[in-house]
A protein has these predicted regions:
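Short secondary-structure junction/hinge motifs that connect adjacent elements
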Residues: 28-55, 68-70
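Residue-level signal for inorganic ion chemistry
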Residues: 16, 111, 192
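A structural signal for short hydrophobic beta-strand segments in well-ordered beta-sheet cores
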Residues: 147-150
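Hydrophobic, small-residue-rich alpha-helical packing segments that form membrane-like cores
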Residues: 139-141, 156
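A short core secondary-structure module
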Residues: 155, 159-201
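Internal helix-loop-helix
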Residues: 54-126, 167-173
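Intrinsic disorder at enzyme termini
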Residues: 1-18
Length: 201
């Protein structure tokens, strides 16, 4: 099987094949010209997200209602984007992947106010998203999570420790999972959007 044979798989459509062609051309014309020497990975990630946004590729990470390229987030488009970027630059692949991972919970389950506030900026490559799930004692065993969220008046106060935060330190907002206590195990976990400049963060 050649590097492109997978594009003929029956569950891919012409739009997916066209995406692969367009992204390949972008990688050759734009990505390879960017100043990526890994001397400042944080700045380079932001540059990559900005450039991917200008080209319309970060719009694959959110639904069309908030600036995305398709009605719903299409995992096939995400996979093709990551596979293509990964052949040219692992950092470009990572930068794109975290946009999708850090916003998918919001795309699927967020309220309209939050979706309107964050998703168009993710689609445009203007915001960097982060994903904060793992903890020192709760990595693959997510149900062992200890970070808590307590309702105080009209807002929640989160308390806990996260580790291995994808895009930690450079993100504009964080998708943070915390225990709200409605049930045992994973049934008592909720997702919060936390701005990078939030008090106490």
């Amino acid at each position: 099987m050649s590097d492109k044979d997978f594009l003929n798989w029956p569950f891919l459509e012409d739009q997916h094949r066209q995406l692969a062609v367009e992204l390949e051309a972008w990688c050759e014309q734009t990505l390879e010209q960017l100043p990526l020497d890994h001397s400042d990975v944080d700045a380079e990630c932001r540059l990559l997200v900005t450039e991917l946004g200008k080209a319309g590729f970060t719009a694959n990470a959110v639904p069309a209602a908030w600036g995305g390229n398709t009605e719903k987030v299409d995992v096939r488009r995400l996979c093709i984007t990551r596979e293509t970027l990964g052949r040219y630059s692992g950092l470009a692949d990572f930068a794109f992947a975290m946009q999708a991972l850090g916003s998918i919970s919001l795309s699927l389950y967020g309220n309209e106010t939050l979706r309107e506030a964050y998703l168009p900026k993710v689609a445009a490559g203007e915001y960097i998203a982060a994903f904060a799930l793992s903890e020192p004692d709760a990595g693959s065993d997510v149900a062992a999570m200890r970070t808590s969220a307590r309702l105080e008046g009209d807002h929640y106060v989160l308390n806990g420790c996260k580790t291995w935060i994808s895009n930690g330190g450079i993100a504009d907002y964080y998708t943070v999972f915390a225990r709200t206590g409605e049930g045992t195990g994973s049934k008592g976990i909720s997702c919060f959007i936390v701005d990078a400049d939030a008090h106490g963060f």
